[in-house]
Amino acid sequence: MSTTQRKDDSHLFTSSCTRQLQVQEDRQQQEKYVIAQPIFVFEKGEHNFKRPAEDSLEETAEPEFTGFLRKRVRSSSVTLHTTDPQSQGVATLSQTRLRSSSFTDVPTFPPCRPVRKNNVFMTSRLLQRSDDMNNVEQGPPMRSSEQVLRPAVLQPSQTQSCQKAGTTFGPGALKSYKTKEKAEHEISEVGSSSSLLSENLPNARSSIQLSTDPCISEAPSGCQPKEDKCSFTSCSSDFVFGENMVERVLGTQKLTQPPLQNLSYAKEKTFKSVLKFPNAVSNSDSIENISLVESAAAFSSKPSQKCLLEKIDVITGEETEHNVLKINCKIFVFNKATESWSERGQGILRLNDTAGRECGTLQSRLIMRNQGSLRLVLNSRLWAQMKIQRASQKNLRITATDLEDDGIKIFLIQASAKDTGFLYAAIHHRLVALRSLAKQGDGGPAESQSDTALPQLNGESCDEDEDEIAQVTKNGSDPSRWSHRQSIVCS
């Protein structure tokens, strides 16, 4: 009896357990249909690891969950999804929030957005189903050329802008405005095609709002961009650059022009009405009619315009003087500090005579100008105490006054042998005459004026040899012989 009772008790126990399990399963199924499982969402980045998805689990889960898949994720907020049993897997969910946090947008499963194909939580059937649903919602596939996001163009009211353009800029501005409207119309067509793409892409909704409805153009002025405001204010302003230029010019002579009848024509022709160049227009018309060869021939046939300078008389101070000798030479000056010769310049040396105060007397001076620049290098008068010495056949040493400090310095004249001989004889001749005049003035025997005075040299040419000049220089101590001779220096 005991064994039979034990068997009955075990049978009753097992039956009661099975009944309890069935009741629990029924309750769970009812709760599953009424209340969906909570979904845990976290904001961290996706993990790169992958886990193989099993289709067998999905097949067992599909009859139980219409459109949901179990996931284990860390959560920061919990949401409750209620499904409609008649939807049969379509993701039309009404979310009821149980516990809120900082997150407001909680994704649903299966997601309504396009999902990557390498997602480990989406199996092949769910991916196929989501693609079919997206194709039904989006319609035919878009071309790659049409999937370019472009901002919508906000057009101002055409009536106001046309009136402003007509009043400010005249008839010429209406043509440019019409062309601008055509270009903006083409841009708006492209924007309308891109607005279709923005409806399908939710990412574009958050960044750019594409629409070409006329209601948006009637929105308040605060929503319009600043560029439209600036363009509208510039059109509405009455200021035109260059207007009334004649009134702003400060001058004694003002250009007079007839009163302008049409305001738009005046604003269009502001600069042309003030300045007129009739010569330039006639020249341009003639140039257009002439070919290139003819213009080149006319240019070459024109005589070259030479700049004719006026002749100016140069006053040197030598106009009243008589030139006796003129040679080309170099001149050096002796520096006592360094005991060396420094070149002063190269040019033409002149020996000039002038009539003295006393009748029959002469006054002479040496003048030298630098070649090229004609800068004055030497300007010294001959006096009785002046010394002259012939250092060599081509060099002649003299004492003369310096132009820099008005002091007496030693100069060296370097020239050809013939020019050096002529210069030495002419200077020595005049120095002897000056010394004799100085002796007579001190109280010496009075002699006739013709014997003591140095006769004025004749400017005519004379031909004498160097040997004769050398003889004169050797016997130059006798001044009486100089008074009876003519000029021995060629001019």
From Swiss-Prot:
Pfam families xrefs: Ran_BP1
Protein name per UniProt: Ran-binding protein 3-like
Statement: the UniProt record of this protein carries the keyword Nucleus: yes
GO cellular component, one term: nucleus
Organism, as annotated: Mus musculus (Mouse)
InterPro entries: PH-like_dom_sf (IPR011993), Ran_bind_dom (IPR000156), RanBP1-like (IPR045255)
Keywords: Cytoplasm, Nucleus
GO biological process: intracellular transport; mesenchymal cell differentiation involved in bone development; negative regulation of osteoblast differentiation; positive regulation of myoblast differentiation
Name of the gene encoding the protein in the UniProt record: Ranbp3l
